[in-house]
């Protein structure tokens, strides 16, 4: 199916909505302003200003609006990986005292890139929790994905055994990627892109004793969400699952658990200690963080 994307101003979006008024459907994907279905073409306009034309008449339909738009965006020089059908992986939770570590792997094929980009998919750190909750469910239905959740008790066990956090992340990334590669089979991704947290050589050194290691076409890039949209998609999925886990843990302990590792977290942990005793932190926190000692001191006051 042919895809074509143009960028529209707010005025132009309103003109398009009026033009396609008789063709507008009721179902809206995440981030969309309207969807119109015409013979040979589906038009999806997004809040980002992107308008996606899909179908055999996509180019012809988009051409009607090209003079009013910014014209085709000048092609930006990109690394070859940016155009590949690829798996991206990213993690969330390693800097948060409360909650698990979540790694997500997501696969975006070439013919899905325009649709995913038009949705406004970008690094989850640039999006609010509300935006994550709005975008992620649709995204997870659109593309193959896998997540791995490392619970707090397991994280604490691994950390007490002397395992560095970088190795923990390497194990989780490899597991999530491996699950997705298996799900995709017989399709083979052209690239597997990890949001870099260590050098590639050290990443594989951490995995040398593992039985199942995904090695082919693996790349590690800093700010990898700018290299391929699959990494941005993975970051959104990982954060969405992390938010769900935080909600679940909050219900279990009877109070809202804050994100991060600041003073607000110290106070929350101290309240948990006072209410339930220090053992409660084992099941909802990363105990090696300095917050544990700070909370213990506050709880004694």
Swiss-Prot record:
Binding site for a divalent metal cation: 90-91, 195
Cofactor: Mn(2+); Mg(2+)
Enzyme Commission no: 3.1.26.4
Free-text cofactor note: Manganese or magnesium. Binds 1 divalent metal ion per monomer in the absence of substrate. May bind a second metal ion after substrate binding.
CDD domains, A to Z: RNase_HII_bacteria_HIII_like, RNAse_HIII_N
Locations listed in the record: Cytoplasm
PROSITE patterns: RNASE_H_2 (PS51975)
InterPro entries from the UniProt entry: RNase_HII/HIII, RNase_HII/HIII_dom, RNase_HIII, RNase_HIII_N, RNaseH-like_sf, RNaseH_sf, TBP_dom_sf
Main localization (coarse): cytoplasm
Molecular function (Gene Ontology), one example: RNA binding
Catalytic activity: Endonucleolytic cleavage to 5'-phosphomonoester
Signal peptide: none
Alphabetized UniProt keyword annotations: Cytoplasm, Endonuclease, Hydrolase, Magnesium, Metal-binding, Nuclease
Gene Ontology cellular component terms for the protein in this record: cytoplasm; ribonuclease H2 complex
Gene Ontology terms: biological process: DNA replication, removal of RNA primer; mismatch repair
Domain named RNase H type-2: residues: 84-301
UniProt record similarity statement: Belongs to the RNase HII family. RnhC subfamily.
Known role: Endonuclease that specifically degrades the RNA of RNA-DNA hybrids.
Descriptive protein name: Ribonuclease HIII
Organism per entry: Geobacillus sp. (strain WCH70)
Lineage: Bacteria, Bacillati, Bacillota, Bacilli, Bacillales
Protein's gene: rnhC
């Amino acid at each position: 199916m042919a895809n074509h994307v143009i960028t529209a101003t707010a005025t132009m979006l309103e003109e398009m909505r009026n033009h396609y008024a008789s063709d507008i459907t009721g179902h809206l994907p995440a981030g969309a302003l309207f969807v119109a279905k015409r013979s040979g073409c589906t038009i999806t306009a997004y809040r980002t200003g992107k308008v996606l034309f899909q179908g055999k008449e996509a180019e012809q339909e988009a051409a009607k609006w090209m003079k009013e738009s910014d014209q085709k965006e000048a092609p930006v020089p990109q690394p070859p990986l940016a155009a590949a059908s690829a798996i991206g992986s990213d993690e969330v939770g390693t800097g948060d005292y409360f909650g698990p570590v979540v790694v997500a792997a997501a696969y975006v094929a070439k013919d899905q890139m325009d649709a995913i980009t038009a949705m406004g998919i970008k690094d989850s750190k640039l999006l609010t929790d509300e935006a994550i909750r709005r975008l992620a469910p649709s995204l997870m239905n659109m593309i193959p994905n896998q997540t791995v959740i490392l619970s707090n008790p397991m994280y604490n066990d691994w950390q007490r055994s002397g395992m560095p956090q970088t190795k923990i992340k390497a194990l989780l990334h490899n597991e999530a990627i491996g699950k997705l590669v298996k799900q995709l089979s017989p399709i083979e991704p052209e690239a597997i892109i990890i949001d870099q947290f260590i050098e590639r050589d050290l990443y594989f050194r951490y995995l040398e004793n593992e039985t199942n290691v995904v090695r082919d076409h693996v790349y590690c890039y800093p700010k990898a969400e700018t290299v391929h949209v699959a990494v941005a998609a993975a970051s959104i999925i990982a954060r969405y699952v992390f938010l769900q886990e935080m909600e679940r843990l909050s219900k279990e302990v009877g109070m809202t658990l804050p994100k991060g590792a600041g003073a607000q977290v110290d106070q929350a942990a101290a309240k948990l200690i006072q209410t339930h005793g220090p053992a409660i932190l084992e099941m909802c926190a990363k105990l090696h963080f300095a917050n544990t000692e700070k909370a213990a001191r506050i709880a004694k006051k």
